[in-house]
């Protein structure tokens, strides 16, 4: 009996050590697992690229805002060739930079919208390293610049948030309700916590994220903040087959919002509405500002 117990004990110890070894290996070799364990937001949520692709086919101007002593934020103002219908403050998603989204911007300006877009710190030509407080500060300061530059137009203002830009679009709208005429969200993230839950590669990390909301950004939480927006029309777009941000995240944000609101269920890839459903998208945006 003692021999059997000894064998069981050694087997159990070997399994534990093996598990620790495997866990340590993946922790050291998989950046995403390491980021989730350490809650390293710069690697969990932001995937900037510095190289800008050519945007000469679009009519735009480039400006630089100094946010802090060492942080320069680049902004891009795209203008339609003909009459302008409204001005859009566009907050892009976690990957790339403004030029990555030129295919999404093009249908807007071709249909009479002026588009102002920014690259957060660390994205494109903008300097610095992204973090949740910093990118929100970049967004708030550039939104005021957007308002200053479009004030003379006397046109309606639309805040448009894509994916990770969704919670920031919600926060901007919440804090400027008298100056925003419509809020558009496409493939929006629900919260930083929901991202960690959705992308956790193992059950333990998923459960850890569920139980610890305080460990994630609480300064702006899309599903919470949208409930504080009163009379601003809201169009929430989410694809049933979105593989980047689960469909339920968009539904949760919609359910938390007050009227007036509209949920548009699509079947496109993540945030591809403006490309795959251009006419319907333009019509729905126009409906929000009529």
For each predicted feature, which ranges?
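Catalytic histidine-centered segment of alpha/beta-hydrolase-like enzymes
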Residues: 269-279
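Short alpha-helix in the alpha/beta-hydrolase fold that links the catalytic acid
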Residues: 104, 222, 246-255
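Hydrolase active-site cap/lid region
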Residues: 171-219, 224-225, 275
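Membrane-embedded segments
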Residues: 68-145
């Amino acid at each position: 009996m003692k021999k059997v117990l000894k064998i069981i004990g050694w087997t159990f110890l070997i399994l534990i050590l093996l598990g620790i070894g495997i866990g340590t290996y993946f922790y050291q070799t998989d950046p995403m697992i390491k980021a989730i364990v350490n809650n390293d937001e710069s690697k969990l949520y932001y995937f900037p690229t510095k190289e800008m692709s050519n945007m000469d086919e679009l009519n735009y101007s480039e400006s630089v805002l100094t946010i802090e002593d060492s942080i320069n934020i680049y902004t891009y103002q795209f203008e339609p060739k003909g009459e302008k219908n409204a001005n859009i403050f566009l907050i892009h998603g976690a990957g790339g930079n403004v030029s990555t989204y030129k295919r999404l911007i093009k249908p807007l300006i071709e249909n009479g919208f002026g588009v102002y877009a920014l690259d957060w710190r660390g994205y494109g030509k903008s300097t610095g390293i992204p973090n949740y407080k910093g990118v929100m500060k970049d967004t708030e300061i550039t939104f005021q610049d957007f308002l200053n530059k479009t004030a003379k137009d006397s046109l309606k203002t639309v805040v448009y948030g894509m994916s990770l830009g969704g919670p920031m679009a919600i926060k901007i709208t919440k804090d400027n309700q008298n100056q925003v005429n419509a809020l558009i969200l496409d493939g929006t993230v629900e919260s930083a916590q929901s991202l960690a839950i959705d992308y956790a590669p193992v059950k333990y990390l998923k459960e850890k994220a569920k139980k610890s909301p305080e460990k994630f950004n609480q300064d702006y939480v899309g599903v919470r903040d949208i409930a504080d927006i009163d009379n601003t029309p809201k169009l929430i777009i989410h694809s049933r087959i979105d593989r980047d941000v689960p469909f339920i995240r968009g539904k949760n944000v919609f359910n938390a919002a007050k009227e007036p609101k509209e949920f548009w269920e699509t079947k496109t890839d993540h945030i591809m509405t403006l490309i795959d459903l251009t006419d319907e998208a333009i019509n729905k945006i126009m409906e929000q500002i009529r």
